[in-house]
Regions:
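Active-site-flanking alpha-helical
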Residues: 68-69, 91, 162-163
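Conserved beta-strand hairpin/beta-sheet module of binuclear metal-dependent hydrolase folds
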Residues: 1-47, 162-176
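Active-site metal-binding motif and surrounding structural segment of the metallo-beta-lactamase
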Residues: 37-88
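Conserved beta-strand scaffold positions in the cores of enzyme catalytic domains, especially
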Residues: 7-9, 81, 133-135
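Active-site neighborhood of phospho(di)ester-bond hydrolases with catalytic His/Asp-centered motifs
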Residues: 29-32, 55-62, 81-84, 152-155, ...
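A generic local structural motif
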Residues: 14-15, 42-46, 67-69, 136-138, ...
Length: 177
């Protein structure tokens, strides 16, 4: 679904990830769960593009429902993977980003269980390590399609980040809770 000019939301279960078109290149923001790969491939094809057009992958944080197929995109499409420096080690080791400390409260919400079962079916209960990552910090304007500016938003994880696309007046966030 196109949510703004050249910005496409790819949804699988409760997780959203985005493809940003910029000229002949694509930027992937977040990488869903490991089994969401086919969603990416189908979406790229529907845009009349090839995986080789994927220029970079930006991760908003190091949780398995956002890093899922990032390593596969890196090795298959040759797209470098970027993440905030505070979550880089978690992404590389597969240990997961530090939680926001509210996990117990989630247990009281019925949607928590639907989310966990959805993530389990899609292979997202464990982070797939990303062997090579580049890092960004608050305020960085990245030289990737869309030229997003990083807005560090710690809380959900220490390295949670939003991405501001100034020329499109769009702020992409990840898990809002």
């Amino acid at each position: 679904m196109q949510v703004a000019p050249g910005i496409h939301r790819l949804t699988q279960g409760v997780v959203c990830f985005y493809l940003i078109e910029d000229g002949g290149k694509l930027l992937l923001v977040d990488a869903g769960a490991p089994k969401d790969w086919d969603v990416l491939v189908g979406s790229v094809s529907a845009l009349g593009r090839k995986l080789e057009d994927l220029d970079a992958v930006l991760l908003t944080h190091a949780h398995s429902d956002h890093t899922g197929f990032a390593e596969r995109a890196r090795t298959t499409a040759g797209a470098p993977v970027w993440i905030h420096q505070a979550d880089a080690e978690a992404a590389k080791t597969g240990k997961g980003g530090k939680n926001d400390g509210k996990a117990t409260a989630y247990l009281l919400r019925p949607e928590f269980y639907r989310t966990v079962f959805s993530l389990a079916r899609r292979g997202a209960l464990k982070i797939v390590p990303i062997h090579e990552v580049s890092t960004f910090a608050d305020g960085d304007k990245l030289d990737v399609p869309g030229h997003p500016q990083v807005v560090h938003a710690p809380g959900h994880t220490d390295g949670s980040a939003a991405l501001f696309l100034e020329d499109r007046s769009v702020l992409l966030t990840a898990t809002p809770w």
